[in-house]
A protein has these predicted regions:
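N-terminus-centered regions that define maturation/targeting leaders and the start
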Residues: 2-6, 12-173
C-alpha cells in the first residue's frame, strides 16, 4: 500500500510541471537596458496594462542594442506561472527602439494565440519579465508559429539581451 501511495504522489508531482518551453538560454551578454514609461524595474505594472484594466501593451524602450544587430525580438514571460508566455514578438526593426503595439511577426503565446495577453495572476504577486533580444539576423519564423520554434530561433540568433521586470498582485484565489 505504501508503494502505491508513493507512486501516486510521484505521479501527481510530475503532473505539476509545464508544457511551456524554456526561455532562450544562450542570449549573449545582458547589455541592453529595457525601460517603460509606465513602470520602473521591480515596480507594480499599472492596472491599464492588466486583465482588470484595458489590457494595453505597456510602452517599452531599449538602449544598448549592438550596431551589428539586424533585428530585435521581445519575449514576455511570467516565471511564477511556469514560464507562461504573454507575448513573443519577432524580427522587430532595430530602430526605433520602442514598442507600444502589436508586432508584424508574433509567435503563439501560452494562451495559444498570437499577440499580447495581459497579466492576470490568479492570486499572489507574479513577476513579468519583458526581455529584449538583439539578433544577428532575422529569425525567419512565420507569424503564428509555435512558441518553441520562435524561442529556438531567438536562441540561435541572440547576441545581447536585457530585461525589465514588473509585478502584478492579485488577492483573488
Amino acid at each position: 500500500m505504501r508503494a502505491l501511495l508513493v507512486g501516486a504522489l510521484l505521479l501527481a508531482v510530475a503532473g505539476c510541471g509545464s508544457d511551456n518551453p524554456a526561455p532562450p538560454s544562450d542570449a549573449g551578454p545582458a547589455d541592453i537596458v529595457v525601460t517603460s514609461s509606465a513602470f520602473d524595474e521591480g515596480a507594480e505594472i499599472p492596472e491599464q496594462f492588466t486583465c482588470t484594466g484595458v489590457g494595453d501593451i505597456p510602452p517599452l524602450t531599449w538602449t544598448g542594442v549592438p550596431a551589428s544587430a539586424a533585428a530585435v525580438a521581445l519575449v514576455v514571460i511570467d516565471p511564477d506561472a511556469h514560464d507562461y508566455y504573454h507575448w513573443v514578438a519577432l524580427d522587430l526593426p532595430t530602430s526605433p527602439a520602442t514598442v507600444d503595439g502589436p508586432a508584424d511577426v508574433e509567435a503563439r503565446n501560452s494562451k495559444g494565440s498570437t499577440g499580447w495577453t495581459p497579466p492576470c495572476p490568479p492570486s499572489g504577486t507574479h513577476h513579468y519579465e519583458f526581455t529584449v533580444y538583439a539578433l544577428d539576423a532575422p529569425t525567419g519564423v512565420a507569424d503564428g508559429s509555435e512558441t518553441a520554434r520562435a524561442l529556438d530561433a531567438i536562441d540561435e540568433h541572440a547576441i545581447a539581451h536585457g530585461t525589465l521586470t514588473g509585478v502584478v498582485s492579485s488577492s483573488a484565489g
